[in-house]
Amino acid sequence: VYTEGEGDKTLVFLSGGGTCSPILDFKSLYSLLSNEYKIAVVEKFGYGFSDVVDEQRDIDTMLSETRMALEKAGIEGPYVLCPHSMSGLEALYWAQKYPEEVEAIIGLDMAVPAYYDEMHISIPITKLGQYGAALGITRWIPGLAESDAIKAGTLSEEEKEIYRAVFY
C-alpha cells in the first residue's frame, strides 16, 4: 500500500486487470488530489511491487487481502473507493458487505456486473497474451509500454524505467 497526502477523507485506488503498477499508473491522478485527500494505492498480489502468490483469486479473498493491507498500513475508513475496471466488482461487493467502511465509490472506467454478463472472453487469446508477456514477446511491440502514466509526464525517468521493467 502506497500512501501520501493528509486530508480528512481517504481515497483508496484499486486497479483493474492489466495494470502493471497501480502506484505508477495512478500517479498522474492522485498527485493532483493528495493536497486535499489522503491517498492509498493498493497493489494487489501479482501487481507492481507486490508479491506473486499461488492462491485462489476469488472476490472474497481479494477483498479480505485489500482490507488487511489497509489495516496493516494503519489506514482507517470509512473510505472513498476509486476502482478501475474489474475492481469495480470488488468495490461494489465491499460496499454491500461492509457498508460502514465505504463512504462513496468513484468509478474510474469501472466495470459493473452486467458488463461481465455480456462480455465474451476468449480464453485462448487471453492465454496467448499471458504467454507472450512471460516469454518477453511484448517487448517487441512498439509503444505497448508507453501508457498514459508515461505520457502524462508525472513519472520521473527512474519511475519510467521501473514501469517498463514491471510491464515486461
Per-range role (PLM):
Residues 41-82, 98:
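Active-site loop/oxyanion-hole signature of alpha/beta-hydrolase fold enzymes
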Residues 77-120:
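Conserved hydrolase catalytic core segment
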Residues 25, 29, 62-66, 87:
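Stable alpha-helical elements in mature extracytoplasmic
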Residues 23-25, 50-56, 117-118:
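Conserved catalytic-core motifs of eukaryotic protein kinase domains, centered on the activation segment
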Residues 6-8, 35, 75-77, 99-100:
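Active-site acidic short loop of glycosyltransferases
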Residues 104-168:
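Flexible "cap/lid" subdomain of the alpha/beta-hydrolase fold that forms the substrate-access gate
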Residues 3-49:
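Conserved HGGG/HGGXW glycine-rich cap/lid loop of the alpha/beta-hydrolase fold
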